[in-house]
């Protein structure tokens, strides 16, 4: 009788959350997936930004996803948790900006609050229910602007269903606001690791150390917890040779795209990201991430 061998199960989840652009795949997730595959680590990519775009499309509000969100409206949408379940009180300036955004988008304030208080909690619950998070030992979030609260909120929920899972955060936001990494860890106990700088040089070694319950690798740019204290390996993770960055794997994006029935573009600016350089080409500006 022929023995059937079960395919290895990925133990790492790579996640991008709203409001990451829905017009194209995440180059961050694509690169990290390829890098982990080179190291023999299987991972699943989750494009929850696309799923959220799809949810907004159901209620005719998908145009706001690809809008330029003023006053960090995107962060406001996901701000109920982890901070509180309260609606909160806006100052007059912030509220007026929100009203202006609603008017320009052609939707009512009531609908904005419905997205925040009904659609998003249901969306987060569906993510938890549709995936077996107990199968993963590590979940990694790539952060940019407009993704902070969505990522924190989801990480908190995943930790609730699988307290043993380790959470790793990194991305463009941490490169600009390096002082925020330990502060986020101090405030949010569901964050286990923060990578400061480029992910390629450290991600596979870090995940292998987590899987083997070994000490944090002696590589720059890693914030971690030890005996209740937040520690760092010091420095910044830096990829000094772009040729060492692998070709991004966008398979998960297109599989999800097709499974949702999108046969045409979901936005007139749809694109395929490629990377030819990283950082400020003049060597001057810290916020430059192109």
Model-inferred region functions:
Residues 11, 19-22, 28, 32-52, ...:
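Glycine-rich beta-alpha loop elements in corrinoid/cobalamin-binding modules
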